[in-house]
Amino acid sequence: MRTPIVAANWKMHKTQPEARQFLADFLPREAGMSGVEIVICPPFTALAAVAGGLTGTRVGLGAQNMSDKPSGAFTGEVSGAMLVDAGCRYVILGHSERRRLFGESDEVVGAKVRAALQHGLIPILCIGETLEEQQAGEADAVNRRQLLAGLEGLTPEQVANLVIAYEPVWAIGTGRNCDPGDAQARIAAVRAVVAEAFGPEAAARVRIQYGGSVKPENMAAYMAQPDIDGALVGGASLDPTSFAAICAAAAEARAR
């Protein structure tokens, strides 16, 4: 059975003091949970504060982006080696905001995934269609294209050990979440692509999250779907009570 993974994507929120306060409120709520892996992905400036606060806990640290370059004259960029040095185990790559606002292509995302793996980081590879693509019936084709580009050059074992996050662009930060049954259909199709390209074992092992307006009140419905293995949580992860409730729902779903 795949262990659920719930990751907090704080985006461009929280100073170091705010991050420390979040942990002070969240960690006591997390302490009794089992059967779920939890990751917090703060902005770069709060990585050190969060890393310190997570010492001795089961909660993992992740980053929200990284360069595909190992080092050099790349102003403003952060390498995989730097993330490892900061204590990161995970890194979010290919988020729709990176693709849409900063022009990251499928090829760039794939290069970042390969670079992350070279540094021992676990990529959380984000894929997802826009509203226009969904309405045109192109969702599965878009997800397939983004997925195969992001996984290009990887071995079945590497694919089995990373995380995929299906985030329909039209559901991110809009309050309009994808129907759990529809999310299951999209994610089952993604898993089928993995099976086709990398084999049934990789497809059975890889964890696939849902993301897009995830809240405490809808998390259980997503976790009831057989192919959904957790969530990549945006806005609701900024509140420790809300995020703890989402994590608890994931843990309870797998305990049944």
Swiss-Prot record:
Active site positions, chain numbering: 95 (electrophile), 167 (proton acceptor)
The reaction(s) this protein catalyses: D-glyceraldehyde 3-phosphate = dihydroxyacetone phosphate
Listed EC numbers: 5.3.1.1
InterPro entries from the UniProt entry: Aldolase_TIM (IPR013785), TIM_sf (IPR035990), TrioseP_Isoase_bac/euk (IPR022896), Triosephosphate_isomerase (IPR000652), Triosephosphate_isomerase_AS (IPR020861)
Pathway annotation from the record: Carbohydrate biosynthesis; gluconeogenesis; Carbohydrate degradation; glycolysis; D-glyceraldehyde 3-phosphate from glycerone phosphate: step 1/1
Record-annotated membrane-spanning stretches: none
Protein localization: Cytoplasm
Pfam families hit by this protein: TIM
Major subcellular location class: cytoplasm
Any GO BP annotation: glycerol catabolic process
Family under the similarity heading: Belongs to the triosephosphate isomerase family.
Record note on quaternary structure: Homodimer.
Its job: Involved in the gluconeogenesis. Catalyzes stereospecifically the conversion of dihydroxyacetone phosphate (DHAP) to D-glyceraldehyde-3-phosphate (G3P).
Protein name as catalogued: Triosephosphate isomerase
UniProt source species: Symbiobacterium thermophilum (strain DSM 24528 / JCM 14929 / IAM 14863 / T)
Name of the gene this protein is made from: tpiA
